[in-house]
């Protein structure tokens, strides 16, 4: 893993560096997940970052995990507990604010969101806004600004702390890209746990592993 703080800025890929044959888990993480010293390596990025997330997020108490309102590409449409997005949130160390809603009642309003008072908001955007081949973020900035200034949500923890994240719909395509999304979100929501994790590089490796183009902007901010 590259050093440096968890990325909170525009995420772009513009090279084709290859994935190392093996990746070595930090000693603390290897010890936490019960990996022997002579077997601290992972042969794929998926194995590596799955283990890393499990180790780091395992340090959280339940009361420290954030509640997230996930908004799909449709405005005010959220996700149920049987969805892949729900599983993604769990793997990122968060709770789905809509987990108790019936699968046929996933269209909500600002009043419901305000009452749930989420700690963070995730908005899925088309791959024309964020995705492979996208390097300009004006559209993403505009969408995020609209969420941050949505009047009814001003009192929520997500807006007060500006925990509003935009995610490319292309990251929902495969297990590897959903893991990339989880790394982005976990690094953004829990920066103290992921200060040494380069989320940009992690996502590049995972997107490459999925066989998809990794040059572009997939997460904002």
Where are these regions (language model features)?
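N-terminal ligand-binding lobe of clamshell/alpha-beta domains
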Residues: 1-221
């Amino acid at each position: 893993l590259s050093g440096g703080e968890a990325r909170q800025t525009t995420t772009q890929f513009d090279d084709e560096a290859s994935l190392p044959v093996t990746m070595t888990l930090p000693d603390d993480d290897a010890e936490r997940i019960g990996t022997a010293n002579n077997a601290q390596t992972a042969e794929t990025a998926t194995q590596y970052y799955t283990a890393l997330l499990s180790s780091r997020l395992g340090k959280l108490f339940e009361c420290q995990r954030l509640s997230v309102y996930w908004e799909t590409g449709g405005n005010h449409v959220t996700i149920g507990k049987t969805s892949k997005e729900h599983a993604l949130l769990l793997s990122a160390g968060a709770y789905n604010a809509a987990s108790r809603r019936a699968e046929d009642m996933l269209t909500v309003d600002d009043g419901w969101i305000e009452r749930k008072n989420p700690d963070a908001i995730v908005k899925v955007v088309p791959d024309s806004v964020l995705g492979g081949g996208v390097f300009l973020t004006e559209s993403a900035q505009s969408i995020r600004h609209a969420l941050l200034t949505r009047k009814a949500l001003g009192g929520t923890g997500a807006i007060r702390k500006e925990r509003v994240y935009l995610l490319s719909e292309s990251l929902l395509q495969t297990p590897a890209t959903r893991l990339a999304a989880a790394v982005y979100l976990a690094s953004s929501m829990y920066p103290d746990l992921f200060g040494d994790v380069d989320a940009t590089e992690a996502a590049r490796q995972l997107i490459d592993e999925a066989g998809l183009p990794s040059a572009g902007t997939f997460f904002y901010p």
